[in-house]
A protein has these predicted regions:
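Low-complexity, Gly/Ser/Thr/Pro-rich intrinsically disordered linker/tail segments
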Residues: 60-99
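Amphipathic alpha-helical coiled-coil/leucine-zipper-like oligomerization segments
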Residues: 1-2
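Short acidic, glycine/serine/threonine-rich helix-capping segments at coil-helix boundaries
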Residues: 5-17, 21-69
Length: 99
């Protein structure tokens, strides 16, 4: 498992895999790290899925809805930086909430 999907809590595996495919592994990990930090994990947001990140995500009980919210924020920030991508935002938003 190149992306270490199996090392994550079961309820986050599908969305993490989808983030790896659509946003790249590093960005997907950063979203998980930010979601864990919102619950007090204190992780460095570096995009690396090492033992500290895996443990913190499990121990902080990161909820799927929290990950979805951070994923939506990523897309909103991307469109703010690159307004020409706004035409894709609604589809990205829907996907972020449905996966």
């Amino acid at each position: 498992d190149k992306n270490k999907v199996e090392s994550l809590p079961e309820e986050l595996r599908h969305i993490f895999f989808d983030m790896c495919v659509n946003q790249g592994k590093s960005r997907g990990v950063k979203i998980l790290q930010r979601a864990a930090n919102a619950k007090g994990a204190g992780l460095k947001v570096d995009g690396g899925l090492g033992p500290k990140t895996i443990a913190a995500i499990s121990e902080s009980n990161v909820e799927l809805d929290r990950v979805r919210a951070y994923r939506v924020k990523y897309y909103a920030d991307l469109v703010t930086r690159k307004p020409d991508l706004e035409k894709f935002y609604f589809g990205w938003y829907k996907r972020a909430l449905e996966v």
